[in-house]
Amino acid sequence: MSNQPNITHFMNNLENQLGCKLFVRSNRGVTLTAEGEKLYQHVSVAYQHLHAAEAELAMERSMESGSITISASEIALHLLLLPILGRFHKQYPGVRLRLLNHSTPEAVESVKNGLADFAVVTTPLQAKKPLKSTSLMSFKEIAVGDHSFQGKEKPMRLKDLIENPLISLGQGSTTYEFYSKFFLENDLVLSPDTEVETIDQVLPLIMNGLGIGFLPELFVRPVIEEGKVCQIPLKENIPEREICLVENHTFPPSIAAEMFKKMLVLK
């Protein structure tokens, strides 16, 4: 604690530095001069801001407040992120969540520019330094068609399958990039009859007979079991894809973002 001589010494030094009288000393105590009043008004505001910041940081440390911005691709959202978002919100209701719906390239760019705390996206992806990607899970995709494919247990060759109208996510998506490469590896060219913006649009189009499509098995399995669509067995093996966490170590994560990341990695 500061004693009286130390306080007096500090007050004298402050007056010398500012070149004006701040205090009027008398037997009754100390009062502020006009200059002292002006300084006090500014200092008191600064103190209030500092006190509020300390209180806010204390609340963030206790996870009573804070915010997280997550950039996510649609498949990553459906297959991994949604249940974790639910658990996190239930455990830390005071933390605000902001979710950006991006393609993988857009999501990676948002993390690079500091617009998102991190991204949860599907491969293929490019994450160059200072970005870092961590695999969270792998998933398999299958060919899916309407009821006309029911009972066809014999695996089809890819070149025969694509004689049917093909529904796909559009150019610029990692899914389009992935299947372009897969088709080329099998001496074929990806040429969708229908391109859509979101994965949610693929399934209804298949169900209504507009064509066949490739969808994550985890995503479409319940609909197959309900008998609304059919899995089409393929001779060719579709490579597995991954869902990855992308971070930017240039920007230190907030306490809330770090806690969410731990929940995401441990799941």
Predicted regions, residues:
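A late-sequence structural motif
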Residues: 80, 230-267
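Central regulatory/effector-binding core of bacterial HTH transcription factors
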Residues: 65-127, 196
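Short beta-strand->loop
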Residues: 132-142, 226-240
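Flexible hinge/capping segments at coil-to-helix
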Residues: 128-166, 170
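Alpha-helical linker/hinge and terminal dimerization helices associated
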Residues: 17-18, 39-61
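Hydrophobic hinge/microswitch elements
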Residues: 103-108, 112-115, 122, 180-232
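A short LG(V/I)-centered, amphipathic sequence patch enriched
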Residues: 13-32
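Secondary-structure junction motif
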Residues: 165-186, 253-255, 261
